[in-house]
Curated annotation (Swiss-Prot):
Record-given protein name: Histone deacetylase 17
Catalytic activity: N(6)-acetyl-L-lysyl-[histone] + H2O = L-lysyl-[histone] + acetate
Annotated Acidic residues bias: 147-158
Residue ranges, annotated region (Disordered): 120-158
PANTHER family given in the database record: HISTONE DEACETYLASE 2-RELATED, HISTONE DEACETYLASE DOMAIN-CONTAINING PROTEIN
UniProt record, GO biological process: chromatin organization
Upper taxonomic lineage: Eukaryota, Viridiplantae, Streptophyta, Embryophyta, Tracheophyta
Localisation: Nucleus
SUPFAM superfamilies referenced in this protein's UniProt entry, alphabetically: Arginase/deacetylase
Superkingdom in the source lineage: Eukaryota
Enzyme Commission designation: 3.5.1.98
Protein species of origin: Arabidopsis thaliana
Annotated spans, Histone deacetylase: 3-50
Length: 158
């Protein structure tokens, strides 16, 4: 028994991935009949080029690969699905098991930093003028010698 999927289902997968508008490299697999591969690649090329293709294949050097009916689409309903639910389930389990061992691509996560992360160490407005500032707080307020402006002329102020 072999897993069979119509090329239209395969083409729908390509159409779905294409919607992400990311660079896309489409490569072949194996284990197909040459007639179905010709149809599959023709349909997928049409999808990738945003071109609607007619069902009739015009005369060309590769027409023999579209035998026996020389049309793009395979008439549905004549292929019996011999796949059992347990077989499909076993394929799914195997795929998920294989995916578990694939190294993920390193990336920088794009997450919003929670606002409570930015807790100011010192806020002049909340300071009580009747309470002395301890040495540790004063040390945090050192003004660098290379800071020339502190006010309206400060170009770094937003």
């Amino acid at each position: 028994m072999a897993f069979s999927m119509l090329f239209t289902g395969h083409a729908e997968c390509v159409k779905f991935v294409k919607k992400f508008n990311l660079p896309l490299l489409v490569t072949g697999g194996g284990g197909y009949t040459k007639e179905n591969v010709a149809r599959c690649w023709t349909v997928e090329t049409g999808i990738l080029l945003d071109t609607e293709l007619p069902n009739e294949i015009s005369e060309n050097d590769y027409i023999k690969y579209f035998a026996p009916d020389f049309s793009l689409k395979i008439p549905g309903g004549h292929i019996e699905n011999l796949n059992t639910k347990s077989y499909i389930s076993s394929i799914k389990v195997q795929i998920l098991e294989n995916l578990r061992y694939i190294q993920h691509a390193p990336s920088v996560q794009m997450q919003e930093v929670p606002p409570d992360f930015y807790i100011p160490d010192f806020d002049e407005d909340e300071q009580n003028p009747d309470v002395r500032v301890d040495q540790r707080s004063r040390d945090k307020q050192i003004q660098r010698d290379d800071e020339y402006f502190d006010g309206d002329n400060d170009n770094d102020a937003s």
